[in-house]
C-alpha cells in the first residue's frame, strides 16, 4: 500500500522523536545535538542563540566568560580557566560558531535536526564536522577534567568566533589583532583540521594562501570574418593554455603521490568573460577588443611566491601581448610570508615542544596520526600564525569521510566521544607543560 505524504511526514517525525529520545539518554550527545540544532548558517547566522547556548555551558563549568563584538551583531565568546601559574603563556582552543549554507532538499536528514541514525550512530547536521563538534568537544573535555579535579598550570582560553566561513575578518582577524588577544599572552592555538577517511588523524601546521588573479587581454576589434594577429581572444587563449600547463604540472605531482594536495600550487579558472552582448545572445560577426579570465590560486608557504608572480607577469599576462593583471584577495594581496619575511607556518619539529606534546597526547589515547600537512584551503589559524603564535589545525575525526560543506555532513557518535577523550589528553598535556618555550623566554625578558 502506498504511504501518503502526511503518513511519511508522521513517520519522519516519529523517527526524529525516537532518535532524540534515544540521545537524551546520553547528555553529552544531547548537548552536541542542541548546539547543532541552532541554525548559524550564512547569510543570516543566529549567533545570539549560539551565544546563549555556549554561555549556559560555560556557566555549568564555572568558566569565566565574556562576549565581545568586534563588529556589531557578530559576537565572539571568550571563556577562561585560570591556571595556577597565569604568568606562563596560555593555551587557546579556538572554534567558529558559523556554518555554511545548506540545500535542505538534497539532504537525507534535515540539516538542523541533528538526527541520529540508530543503525550506525551517525549524527547528521551541518556543522557536525565543520566545526561545532570541536567547539563542544573542548567543553566536554574541560567538564571531564574538572570532574577529576584537574588543575591547569597554564591558563586555558576557549574562543568561539563568528564569520570564519566568510573570511573571518570580523571574527578571528580582529580578535588576533586586538588588545584582548595581546593580554592573553597565548603560547599555542588549536584550531580546526579535517576529517580523515582512514584510521589516522590529520595534523596541519600551515595553510595555503589564497591569491585571486584576474588577467585581461586587449586587442584591436575586427570583423568576425577577418584573420589577424593579436586579437584579445587569441591573446587570452594563449595565456589560458599556459596556465593550464602549469596547473597540470602541479596536479601531476599530487596524482603521482609525490606531493600532498596542500603542498602544491593550485590554479583553477573560475570565470571567463568576453564577447559583445546582443539582445539575443552575443554579436557573432565581431571579434571583441577585450577579454578576461579569473583564477583562484592557492600557494603553500613552502612555495616560491615571488617566482610565481614573475611567471604571471612574464608568461600569463605579458605586456608584450597587450595583457594586464590584477592580483588580490579581499582587495588586498595576501602573502605566504609574515612582515619579517618568514613563511607563515608552525614548526613541526623538535623546535616546537607543543607539537611533540600533541603527538604524545594522541598516542596516549591510542590513536594514530599522519604526516604533518598543509591545509589546502584557509582557516582562522592563519590570523594567529601571522601574529607569530604557533597554531595547529586538528579535528579529531578518523574513519570519517570528508563532508565539510557537503550534503549529509555527519559525524559518528562514537568518533565524537573518542574525540573528547583525545582533547582531555591534549589539554592535560598542554596545560601541565612546565618547561619554558621560546615564547616563555621572551615573556621573561620583558618582565
Ligand atoms: Zn571550519
Positions of PLM-derived features:
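Cleavable N-terminal signal peptides of Sec/SRP-targeted secreted and luminal proteins
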Residues: 5-23
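Solvent-exposed loop/turn segments at secondary-structure junctions
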Residues: 41-43, 72, 85-86, 97-101, ...
Amino acid at each position: 500500500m502506498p504511504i501518503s505524504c502526511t503518513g511519511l511526514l508522521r513517520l519522519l517525525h516519529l523517527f526524529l522523536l525516537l532518535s532524540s529520545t534515544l540521545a537524551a539518554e546520553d547528555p553529552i550527545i544531547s548537548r552536541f545535538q542542541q548546539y547543532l540544532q541552532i541554525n548559524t548558517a550564512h547569510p543570516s547566522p543566529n549567533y545570539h542563540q549560539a551565544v546563549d547556548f555556549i554561555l549556559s555551558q560555560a556557566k555549568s563549568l564555572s568558566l569565566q566568560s565574556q562576549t565581545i563584538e568586534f563588529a556589531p551583531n557578530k559576537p565572539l565568546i571568550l571563556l577562561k580557566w585560570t591556571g595556577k601559574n597565569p604568568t606562563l603563556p596560555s593555551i587557546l582552543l579556538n572554534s567558529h560558531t558559523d556554518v555554511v549554507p545548506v540545500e535542505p532538499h538534497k539532504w537525507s536528514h534535515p540539516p538542523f535536526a541533528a538526527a541520529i541514525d540508530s543503525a550506525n550512530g551517525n549524527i547528521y547536521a551541518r556543522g557536525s564536522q565543520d566545526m561545532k563538534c570541536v567547539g563542544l568537544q573542548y567543553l566536554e573535555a574541560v567538564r571531564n577534567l574538572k570532574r577529576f579535579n584537574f588543575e591547569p598550570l597554564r591558563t586555558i582560553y576557549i574562543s568561539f568566533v563568528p564569520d570564519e566561513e566568510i573570511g573571518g575578518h570580523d571574527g578571528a582577524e580582529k580578535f588576533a589583532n586586538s588588545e584582548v588577544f595581546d593580554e592573553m599572552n597565548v603560547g599555542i592555538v588549536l584550531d580546526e583540521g579535517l576529517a580523515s577517511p582512514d584510521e589516522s588523524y590529520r595534523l596541519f601546521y600551515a595553510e595555503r594562501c589564497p591569491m585571486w588573479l584576474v588577467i585581461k587581454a586587449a586587442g584591436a576589434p575586427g570583423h568576425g570574418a577577418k584573420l589577424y594577429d593579436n586579437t584579445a581572444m587569441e591573446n587570452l587563449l594563449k595565456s589560458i593554455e599556459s596556465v593550464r600547463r602549469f596547473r597540470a604540472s602541479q596536479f601531476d605531482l599530487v596524482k603521482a603521490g609525490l606531493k600532498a594536495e596542500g603542498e602544491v600550487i593550485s590554479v583553477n579558472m573560475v570565470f571567463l568573460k568576453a564577447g559583445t552582448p546582443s539582445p539575443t545572445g552575443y554579436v557573432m560577426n565581431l571579434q571583441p577588443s577585450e577579454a578576461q579570465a579569473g583564477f583562484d590560486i592557492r600557494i603553500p608557504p613552502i612555495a616560491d611566491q615571488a617566482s610565481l608572480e614573475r611567471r604571471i607577469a612574464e608568461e600569463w599576462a605579458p605586456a608584450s601581448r597587450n595583457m594586464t593583471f590584477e592580483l588580490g584577495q579581499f582587495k588586498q594581496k595576501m602573502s605566504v610570508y609574515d612582515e619579517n619575511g618568514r613563511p607563515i607556518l608552525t614548526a613541526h619539529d623538535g623546535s616546537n615542544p607543543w607539537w611533540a606534546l600533541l603527538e604524545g597526547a594522541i598516542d596516549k589515547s591510542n590513536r594514530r596520526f599522519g604526516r604533518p600537512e598543509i591545509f589546502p584551503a584557509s582557516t582562522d589559524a592563519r590570523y594567529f600564525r601571522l601574529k607569530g603564535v604557533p597554531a595547529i589545525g586538528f579535528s579529531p575525526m578518523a574513519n570519517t569521510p570528508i563532508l565539510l560543506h557537503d550534503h549529509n555532513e555527519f559525524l559518528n557518535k562514537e568518533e565524537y566521544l573518542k574525540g573528547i577523550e583525545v582533547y582531555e589528553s591534549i589539554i592535560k598535556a598542554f596545560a601541565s607543560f612546565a618547561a619554558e618555550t621560546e615564547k616563555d623566554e621572551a615573556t621573561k625578558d620583558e618582565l
